[in-house]
């Protein structure tokens, strides 16, 4: 049986259903303070701060080694999707908490984040997810998970006026459309911007 190419797509007249874009919750500055205060170990404080200030993926976080951290420049090299290397930056608070955590370590594992008990293995993605979920429940915070930190960092950066191309570079997105999903800013920010620039 012969096979031919279809000249016209049968799907061309079918319109995409418009789904309402939901503004997903982000972690507020107040939530971050509560999460920090709720931590009972230095590792978790350092982990939360690094996730919040860099916007890295949880898979990138657990792959980090001590040697990847440049404290003087407050930056680290991560390997994203498809093993693409990129540089990300962390704030002064993260630097202090990371230094305190590393000073407290008694193991020689090259991994940046390890389990709290012997044999001090490299922390796994599931370990980070479970820890954050437990912390969120303890503090009655709604659905605390690693990606929420990434979304919060991106939303914060966009809200404060960081150009979308720079946010794209920090997040390691190959397509700007992916980054644009974080640009669904809340209405109060739109109103404030209108007052600042238009009114």
Feature locations, PLM:
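Conserved catalytic core of the tyrosine transesterase superfamily
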Residues: 1-199
């Amino acid at each position: 049986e012969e096979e031919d190419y279809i000249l016209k797509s049968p799907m061309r007249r079918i319109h995409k259903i418009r789904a309402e874009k939901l503004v997903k919750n982000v972690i507020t500055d107040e939530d971050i303070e509560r999460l920090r205060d709720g931590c009972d170990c230095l590792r978790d404080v350092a982990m939360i701060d690094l996730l919040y200030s860099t916007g890295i993926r949880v898979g990138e976080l657990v792959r980090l080694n001590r040697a990847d951290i440049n404290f003087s420049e407050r930056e680290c090299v991560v390997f994203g999707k498809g093993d693409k290397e990129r540089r990300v930056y962390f704030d002064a608070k993260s630097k202090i908490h990371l230094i305190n955590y590393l000073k407290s370590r008694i193991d020689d594992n090259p991994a940046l984040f390890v389990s709290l008990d012997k044999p001090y293995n490299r922390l796994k993605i599931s370990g980070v997810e479970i820890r954050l979920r437990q912390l969120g429940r303890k503090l009655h915070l709604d659905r605390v998970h690693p990606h929420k930190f990434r979304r919060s960092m991106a939303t914060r950066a966009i809200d404060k006026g960081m150009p979308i191309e720079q946010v794209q570079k920090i997040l390691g997105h190959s397509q700007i459309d992916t980054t644009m999903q974080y640009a669904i800013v809340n209405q109060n920010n739109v109103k404030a911007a209108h007052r600042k620039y238009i009114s």
